[in-house]
């Protein structure tokens, strides 16, 4: 059996979209599941779109996602170089071989020439059958040229796709595509065929947008007498629009790149776990997987033909599940940079607050909004003191707050246990239920009905002076 070798071949043009991450992930997982190799290859043939530092960004993204190439730039391997701009001479050699075999030709048309809006609809093949003496004269005169693939004018080209089955295209619809540009650089459609063959790629896993190009690739394999690899074209990742419809995932749907999601506070492992299930179904009902577990069970048979819809709420769920597996210490250390503007007292007691937040946030990016009241206390409406469940009204709150404040003023050791003991003693002697007492205290301390932790935690984290000042403010608002 042929050794499984897959590749991820991005263009260095910017951030890594979720769809590209999924392509890399599936290639990696399929290789690992079959004890094969996963290659990283940089397709930088379009120098006009090249973004500085993009290659490092791609490598860093893969590293953060725990996708480790076996071969590629910076990873070693016997099939290098793994950057297409460094393989220029290789492509020219094979293009000239096609010319000699009659499967390609030099096109001397200038920019805009040789194209027609009717008939064929693309390049009209002006140079396809130029006499050799005309070609020689143009070459001698130094006229610039591109090299085009000579497509068959009749018949059909069929290829098998593991996801979509047999796909057939009429050859008459195929334009004589450019293989080598005037600057000597190959086009994507040519370079990737040469590289996939020379690097012994067994399975090409890529987006469905390349289905229309694949017949041209298959013909190139036939022209060279090479066995084509297996093709796996993945359906797109979609986003849900406001009207309920779906369209290809883009920035209007929210964050769409791996780096953006990480900046929002999603864990890389949660992102890759969720992205793996966007179009692939494992045989069990299990959803949370480690990379190692997915690398053991991933199969192409589990891939769907239908587009997957990116669901941010589902990603929140995955991230929450991963938070649960973290130790309180690890969560505290990782979450502190997302805390925003916090007081020194909160910072000093961050492990305590972080432990409360761990089960209350779906991602780190939600933390600042849940705790901003500690450092930035905003005014609130006294209507918040109403709570039917706990039988609290603003009038009732006006009775409770002064009494509770008096009790707290007598707490000399402002520790969690001392505060807790004092409040419980007050509740017991008052004859009121705990919720009845705690509700007005929570509102006066936080200015909001929902907080991480209970009233005792709020009192401790605010500190005695600030806590009593906020309760006094509540008393005055209710007067």
Enumerate the predicted regions with their spans.
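Residue-level signal for inorganic ion chemistry
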Residues: 27, 58, 98, 102, ...
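Charged substrate- and nucleic-acid-binding regions of tRNA-handling and nucleotidyl-transfer enzymes
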Residues: 416-478
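Small-residue-rich helix-loop
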Residues: 328-430
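N-terminal Rossmann-like or analogous alpha/beta NTP/dinucleotide-binding catalytic cores
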Residues: 1-118, 213-226, 270
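Residue-level detector of well-ordered alpha-helical segments, enriched
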Residues: 270, 314, 331, 349-356, ...
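Conserved phosphate-binding loops in nucleotide/dinucleotide-binding enzymes
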Residues: 81-85, 180-181, 199-210, 238-274, ...
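Active-site cores that bind ATP or allylic diphosphates and position pyrophosphate for catalysis
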Residues: 97, 105-249, 257, 282
């Amino acid at each position: 059996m042929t050794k499984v070798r897959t590749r991820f071949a991005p263009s260095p043009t910017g951030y890594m979209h979720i769809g590209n991450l999924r392509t890399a992930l599936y290639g990696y997982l399929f290789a690992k599941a079959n004890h094969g190799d996963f290659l990283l290859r940089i397709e930088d043939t379009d120098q006009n779109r090249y973004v500085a530092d993009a290659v490092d960004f791609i490598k860093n993204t893969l590293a953060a996602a725990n996708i480790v190439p076996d071969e590629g730039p910076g990873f070693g391997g016997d099939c290098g170089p793994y950057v297409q701009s460094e393989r220029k001479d290789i492509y020219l050699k094979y293009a000239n071989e096609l010319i000699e075999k009659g499967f390609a030709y030099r096109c001397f048309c200038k920019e805009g020439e040789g194209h027609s809006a009717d008939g064929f609809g693309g390049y009209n093949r002006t140079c396809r059958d130029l006499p050799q003496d005309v070609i020689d004269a143009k070459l001698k005169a130094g006229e610039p040229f591109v090299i085009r693939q000579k497509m068959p004018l009749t018949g059909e080209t069929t290829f098998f796709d593991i996801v979509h089955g047999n796909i057939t295209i009429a050859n008459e619809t195929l334009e004589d595509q450019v293989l080598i540009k005037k600057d000597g650089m190959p086009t994507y459609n040519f370079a990737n065929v040469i590289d996939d063959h020379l690097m012994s790629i067994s399975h090409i896993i890529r987006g469905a947008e390349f289905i229309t190009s694949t017949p041209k690739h298959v013909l190139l394999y036939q022209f060279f007498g090479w066995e084509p690899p297996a093709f796996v074209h993945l359906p797109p990742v979609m986003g849900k629009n406001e009207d309920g419809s779906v369209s290809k995932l883009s920035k209007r749907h929210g964050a769409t790149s791996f780096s953006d999601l990480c900046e929002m506070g999603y864990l890389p492992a949660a992102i890759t776990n969720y992205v793996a299930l966007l179009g692939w179904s494992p045989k069990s009902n299990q959803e949370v997987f480690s990379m190692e577990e997915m690398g053991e069970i991933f199969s192409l048979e589990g891939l769907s033909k239908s587009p997957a819809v990116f669901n941010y709420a589902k990603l929140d769920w995955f991230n929450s599940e991963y938070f649960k597996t973290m130790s309180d210490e690890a969560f505290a250390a990782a979450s502190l940079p997302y805390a925003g503007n916090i007081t020194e007292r909160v910072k000093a007691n961050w492990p305590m607050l972080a432990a409360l937040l761990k089960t209350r946030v779906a991602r780190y990016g939600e933390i600042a909004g849940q705790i901003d009241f500690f450092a930035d206390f905003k005014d609130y409406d006294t209507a918040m003191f109403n709570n039917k469940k706990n039988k609290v009204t603003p009038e009732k709150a006006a009775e409770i707050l002064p009494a509770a404040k008096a009790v707290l003023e007598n707490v000399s050791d402002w520790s969690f246990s001392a505060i807790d003991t004092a409040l419980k003693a007050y509740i017991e002697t008052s004859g009121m239920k705990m919720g009845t007492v705690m509700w007005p205290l929570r509102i006066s301390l936080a200015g909001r009905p929902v907080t991480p932790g209970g009233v005792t935690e709020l009192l401790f984290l605010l500190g005695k002076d600030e806590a009593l000042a906020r309760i006094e403010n509540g008393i005055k608002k209710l007067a």
